[in-house]
């Protein structure tokens, strides 16, 4: 039915307007949301530098804590370092035939020790800043102390060790702390381009025996090598083995004898 005051043509012209307005509304609403990002990794790219910087920082801290942090004394050696880490440093003093002190220089010359970073030399500078090392697997003749006489070749062992390692860089493969708060370690030093096991060299010269304690001895897997070297030095009558066999007293026997003597005097 045609409205009497209208025209058919005007009605036809308005028929498509509601649909056209709906389409425009839909288009304008989707446009208001913004167009989708064409790069799905854009956010990751923005965060990547921050994450990378953080990871690099953590790695640097771990590197410093495990390999470049200087250890000023035996008490500061972490338990997880024993049997897992070696320590590099300069020998600053030799106490007797089988122990010494050294100044830890992590990284060595590669990070400036000896040319950019000075290794202290005076006793005052070194006080409280060195690590006492007990050479693993060997026992040198006992020197005179606390009223006890020195064993034969005690002075020779001390002189040899002093000349061999004092003021030299050594690498210590550490195993544990002993009852005297020394770090027990197999020690290597470079001599004429060759890396030498200090304890083994002492045994070869008859300046130490293999460690004879029934428990707690550390050899770093070198026990058989040390025992063979000792047998050879004994056959060739070197150092401690040069005297009469009936008069020989090992460092362990010497210490056991004097411990019993002290105990009887105190009781």
From Swiss-Prot:
What InterPro entries is this protein classified in? SNase_OB-fold_sf, Staphylococal_nuclease_OB-fold
List of residues binding Ca(2+): 139
Q: Which Gene3D superfamilies match?
A: 2.40.50.90
Where does the TNase-like domain start and stop, copy by copy? Answer: 85-243
Q: Which PROSITE patterns match?
A: TNASE_3
The Polar residues compositionally biased stretches are 1-11
**Where is this gene product found?**
Mitochondrion; Membrane
User: Mainly resides where?
Assistant: mitochondrion
Transmembrane spans = 47-63
Q: Does the keyword Transmembrane apply?
A: yes
The record ties this protein, via Pfam families, to: SNase
Q: How does it sit in the membrane?
A: Single-pass membrane protein
The ranges of region (Disordered) come to 1-31
Q: Which UniProt keywords apply?
A: Calcium, Endonuclease, Hydrolase, Membrane, Metal-binding, Mitochondrion, Nuclease, Transmembrane, Transmembrane helix
Q: What are the GO cellular component annotations?
A: membrane; mitochondrion
Q: Does the keyword Transmembrane helix apply?
A: yes
Q: Active site annotated at which positions?
A: 134, 142, 182
GO terms assigned for molecular function: endonuclease activity; metal ion binding
Q: Where is the composition biased (Basic and acidic residues)?
A: 12-23
Give EC number(s), comma-separated: 3.1.-.-
Q: Name the family the entry cites.
A: Belongs to the LCL3 family.
Q: What name does the UniProt record give this protein?
A: Probable endonuclease LCL3
What organism is recorded for this protein? Fusarium vanettenii (strain ATCC MYA-4622 / CBS 123669 / FGSC 9596 / NRRL 45880 / 77-13-4) (Fusarium solani subsp. pisi)
Q: What is the lineage of its organism?
A: Eukaryota, Fungi, Dikarya, Ascomycota, Pezizomycotina
Q: Which gene encodes it?
A: LCL3
